[in-house]
Amino acid sequence: MAKSNNVYVVNGEEKVSTLAEVAKVLGVSRVSKKDVEEGKYDVVVEEAAVSLADTEEVVEEVVTEEEDILEGVEVVEDEEEEEAAEDVEEPTSEEDSEDEWEEGYPVATEVEEDEDEEIEYPEVGDFEDEKAIKKYIKGLTDEQLQAWCELEGAEWVENEHRNINRMRMAMAIKAVHFPELAKKPSSKKKSKYAEYTTEELVEMAIDNNVEVRDDKGNERILRMYTIIALREAGLIS
């Protein structure tokens, strides 16, 4: 039976009915309506009545081919939050907070070395454990951390948000020095709709006069809504 209240589809697959449940699924302390509207998280609001039973299978299949796009939007998992909590120390005053801290990360207030002087970065085997490398990373600027990653050949997916990008660089360089700590890639089931591009699905809907819900400019949401509409019209199985 369809529900009349809003349903939040989190990460394209898990459906919950409240923002508190959305935050719990994402592993963050709080998610506001504004966060959802601005697209800060991968959350889709089902505004109209939609049969959850009909949608569940589609969302589950569609999300498998889209998950690579979301790499690291598992960026604030419990493990990373705990690490951030350990690493960040509160500044001693409001003035210190403005001058020496930026979005939870310490920034250098004085240039202790010549900017042109090349840093001699540690090599693999120089750190005793993960705690030691984490302490070393804390003392690097974003530019120095990036240079170290590039020097070591560490790979990460860049993100426009500074904190997320820094976290990914830190995880990438730690994986080089401690490969046993790196997360193993999970095997993913290929969606049976992978053979269709989003454009082909949309064209199929247009050719058959199938109405597709407003995607609000998000291509992944457009793809999901188009597949749902085509399934309901009996054009794909």
UniProtKB/Swiss-Prot annotation:
Cleaved signal peptide residues: none
Stretches for region Disordered: 73-105
Disulfide bonds: none
Transmembrane segments: none
Biased segments, Acidic residues type: 73-103
Protein function: Hypothesized to function in the shutoff of host biosyntheses. But it seems dispensable both for host shutoff and for phage multiplication. Its shutoff function is probably not entirely specific to host activities.
Name of the protein this chain belongs to: E3 protein
Encoding gene per record: 44
